[in-house]
């Protein structure tokens, strides 16, 4: 079943994500912002990814370069190459639905990986650069 959710306060996100089986990250190939500064895709921090990892759930995401720092295809996420095609997403969801062992392994991998990308660990990296 698909559930579309209204705004959720940030503090409630982990609880909401925990109720889901598969988490989607349907990014587009380029991101622009007001002020005509151009494509900021290379500089975007995928905060949603860190939230998803922390609850140890299955992730299906667009083939988006900035995600590949953390995402290893088929190890902790499914990358949809033809992400503009809704049927590609549907196909990946259905494939995962019938592979409980793969779901278990990917979930476990994501939770372990989340420790590397926790707020505390990311803050340590930023402080190293600043000092």
Describe the function of each predicted region.
Residues 1-22, 31-33:
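Nucleotide-activated donor-binding/catalytic signature segment of Leloir-type glycosyltransferases, i.e.
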Residues 10-13, 86, 103, 115-126:
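Amphipathic alpha-helical segment in the mid-to-C-terminal domain
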Residues 23-25, 51-54, 58-61, 66:
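Short hydrophobic beta-strand element within catalytic cores of glycosyltransferases
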Residues 25-41:
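Short Ser/Thr-rich beta->loop micro-motif in glycosyltransferases that lines
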Residues 25-27, 45, 62-63, 69, ...:
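Conserved acidic donor-binding loop of glycosyltransferase catalytic domains
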Residues 92-98, 119-131:
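C-terminal alpha-helical cap of glycosyltransferases
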Residues 95, 101-116:
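A short, well-ordered alpha-helix in the C-terminal region of glycosyltransferases
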């Amino acid at each position: 079943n698909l559930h579309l959710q209204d705004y959720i306060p940030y503090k409630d996100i982990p609880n909401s994500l925990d109720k889901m089986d598969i988490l989607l990250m349907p990014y587009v190939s380029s991101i622009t912002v007001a002020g005509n500064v151009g494509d900021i895709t290379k500089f975007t921090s995928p905060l949603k990814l860190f939230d998803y990892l922390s609850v140890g759930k299955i992730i299906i995401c667009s083939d988006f370069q900035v995600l590949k720092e953390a995402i290893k295809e088929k190890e902790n996420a499914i990358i949809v190459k033809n992400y503009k095609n809704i049927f590609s997403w549907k196909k990946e969801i259905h494939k995962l639905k019938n592979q409980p062992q793969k779901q278990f392994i990917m979930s476990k991998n994501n939770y372990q990986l989340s420790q590397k990308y926790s707020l505390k660990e990311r803050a340590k990296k930023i402080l190293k650069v600043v000092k």
